[in-house]
């Protein structure tokens, strides 16, 4: 693990004397800087522009070197707004990539891409910092153990279980519940596993970032009274920020997570919301740097950029990083290059369906489209595997029969098919679940359902033991015992009405 101690003022002044450039051109967030011969910075070095604008306001802009153009000129991308910069301003080469604070001091705090706190809670201890650009762990350091990561969410644990120390994608269009599902996972993992999480808000709404922070304070994931006892560090590079910040904020969050894994030897959860915005920011930067676009206007380096981020997210012999990434799917098209490139790196996919959301079934996880490499009998056990396969078969048969039902009606089906449809509708409703983070909207208390309880519940539905209970008893409940209790309440209500 490379640790950069903070440099003293005298060290910075010698760097200033040695490597001082001047701005030659500014095009939006892209700067061309001229350096003296033999004093050129390396690719990915951080450059700092300090000075005053025309209104005598202090300017402090950090940039990252992206291209060496020749004639002692480099092209750099700014990590913050370039308002007020002028040609001829002095630029300092720091001589190293961007470095951010790491370790326990980051917990309970909100940072920007540069690792600066933005929550008005005072400075952060920066004695231990780490560069955001690092190579992935060597093969010999990797850990290949297979173990399931229980989330307490029925549809996920049963049909597309997550693997500890690997990558999971949440796929869905706009407004189907990706961010709510991520918030629920952070809540469940902090409470059930007591694990440390790092949340990277990449190019998403500032309002959602604020909501998430408030939600975490309410649920105790962030401990306001004793910040050091918090379970999460937050790194935000939101929609309103320049593409350079949105492109690098994922690496800042990952660097903080890597320290917990490699030095503290912990199991860490890294949430990225949204990985598509990382690709989108890379596309903007690529166009600004003058690269020829590839398919659908994306950058030609799409696979390389994605790989350099994803390959660092892994399990080592010291600890693990389990990453859950929301993936916005443009126009619900899974063949778009951005989601398609992301798919290649994932061990499990949780696909959110607009059709289920329209029916009011939340989480709107599509049980047939969601997949996991963990759903194999020799990993999860025969009982879990058999139950999951029978649930999928029942739902698939229901899907096949829907056209016949729409044209001819239920009465035209055979007795066996009618029973399959009835059970499939109960399964569909039982896959819904009240969330802790949605209590304020639904009024229903959240439920955490263990894997053994989940399997038992679906086995009872498939066996036909619950055929006599009404469909609505299965909707938005936790375990199967709550279904029978809800059915009794519904029966009492209907008797009172009579």
From Swiss-Prot:
Cysteines joined through disulfide linkages: none
Organismal lineage: Eukaryota, Viridiplantae, Streptophyta, Embryophyta, Tracheophyta
Nucleotide-binding as UniProt keyword: yes
Molecular function via GO: ATP binding; ATP hydrolysis activity; proton-transporting ATP synthase activity, rotational mechanism
GO biological process: proton motive force-driven mitochondrial ATP synthesis
GO annotations of cellular component type: chloroplast thylakoid membrane; mitochondrion; proton-transporting ATP synthase complex
Reactions performed catalytically: ATP + H2O + 4 H(+)(in) = ADP + phosphate + 5 H(+)(out)
Designated name of the protein: ATP synthase subunit beta, chloroplastic
Organism of provenance: Phormium tenax (New Zealand flax)
Name of the coding gene: atpB
């Amino acid at each position: 693990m490379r640790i950069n101690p903070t440099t003293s003022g005298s060290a910075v002044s010698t760097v200033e004397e040695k490597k001082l450039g001047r701005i030659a051109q500014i095009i939006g967030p892209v700067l061309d800087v001229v350096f003296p011969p033999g004093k050129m910075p390396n690719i990915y070095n951080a450059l700092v522009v300090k000075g005053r604008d025309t209104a005598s306001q202090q300017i402090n802009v950090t940039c990252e070197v992206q291209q060496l153009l020749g004639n002692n000129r480099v092209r750099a991308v700014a990590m913050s707004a370039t308002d007020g910069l002028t040609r001829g301003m002095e630029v300092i080469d720091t001589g190293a990539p961007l470095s951010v604070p790491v370790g326990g001091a980051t917990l309970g705090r909100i940072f920007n891409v540069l690792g600066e706190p933005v929550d008005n809670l005072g400075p952060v201890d920066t004695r231990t910092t780490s560069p955001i650009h690092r190579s992935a762990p060597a093969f010999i350091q990797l850990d290949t153990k297979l173990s399931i990561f229980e989330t307490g969410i029925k549809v996920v644990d049963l049909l597309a279980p997550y693997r500890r120390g690997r990558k999971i994608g949440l796929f869905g269009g706009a407004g189907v519940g990706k961010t709510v599902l991520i918030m629920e996972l952070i809540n469940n993992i902090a409470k059930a596993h007591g694990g440390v999480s790092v949340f990277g808000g990449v190019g998403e709404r500032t309002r959602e970032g604020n909501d998430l922070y408030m939600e975490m304070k309410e649920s105790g994931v962030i401990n306001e009274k004793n910040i050091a006892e918090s379970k999460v560090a937050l790194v935000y590079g939101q929609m309103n920020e320049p593409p350079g910040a949105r492109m690098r904020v994922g690496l800042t969050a990952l660097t903080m997570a890597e320290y917990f894994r490699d030095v503290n030897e912990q199991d860490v959860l890294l949430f990225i919301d949204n990985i598509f915005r990382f690709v989108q920011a890379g596309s903007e930067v690529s166009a600004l740097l003058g690269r020829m676009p590839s398919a659908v206007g994306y950058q030609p380096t799409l696979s390389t950029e994605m790989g350099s981020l994803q390959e660092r997210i892994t399990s080592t012999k010291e600890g693990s990083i389990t990453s859950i990434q929301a993936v916005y799917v443009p126009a619900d098209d899974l063949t778009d290059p951005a989601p398609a490139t992301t798919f290649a790196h994932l061990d499990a996919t949780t696909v959110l369906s607009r059709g289920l959301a329209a029916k009011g079934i939340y989480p709107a996880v599509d049980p047939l489209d969601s997949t996991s490499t963990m759903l194999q009998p020799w990993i999860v056990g025969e009982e879990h595997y058999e139950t999951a396969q029978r649930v999928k078969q029942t739902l698939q048969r229901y899907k096949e029969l829907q056209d016949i039902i729409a044209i001819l009606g239920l009465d035209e089906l055979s007795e066996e098919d009618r029973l399959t449809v009835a059970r499939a509708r109960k399964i569909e409703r039982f896959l819904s679940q009240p969330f802790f983070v949605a209590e304020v909207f639904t009024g229903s208390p959240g439920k955490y359902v263990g894997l053994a309880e989940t399997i038992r519940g679906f086995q009872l539905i498939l066996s036909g033991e619950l055929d006599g209970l009404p469909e609505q008893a299965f909707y938005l409940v936790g375990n199967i015992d709550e279904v029978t209790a809800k059915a009794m309440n519904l029966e009492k209500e209907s008797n009172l009405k009579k």
